[in-house]
């Protein structure tokens, strides 16, 4: 697992750094105030339970496995920081360096499959307005009989505020702007090269994770 972490970081170091910042709520450190809402949302959804218990939930030796993986990631990061010429170009363009990972980054939920959260809130608002029984009739949830009663501890008025703004802020993809680049990478020549790359990558089949081309003779 150490080797897996090392190899993954070697192949995807910049992606790993952006993920780490998304997971730790530190994107604004490199992209400024426009990312504050994202970082606030990230920290709001941060896991605050028993970390050891969470790590071992995935596997009896989950803590050891994840810590070994993180150690591998960090070993490669250290080798890059100590050898500046190995630093991938995107870091140089932004004027940043990769930072160490922790186990918390590995189990972060910033890419969770939570697509029904909006529907859950809409149902909660409907229950607050007309009650659970009428909502069941309107939504036709048969043959099941879900319990739609709201927890009495919930302030129902708060359901009608923009509760999901922090969630959507931390879930959105990271977008870079010209002002984020170091001055030497904002020249006309650099922009021309970037535009050429964008033209090449317009084809949806031009890129892909782990794509391989094998000769027919094989």
Predicted ranges, named:
Residues 1-218:
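Substrate-recognition/specificity elements adjacent to catalytic centers across diverse enzyme folds
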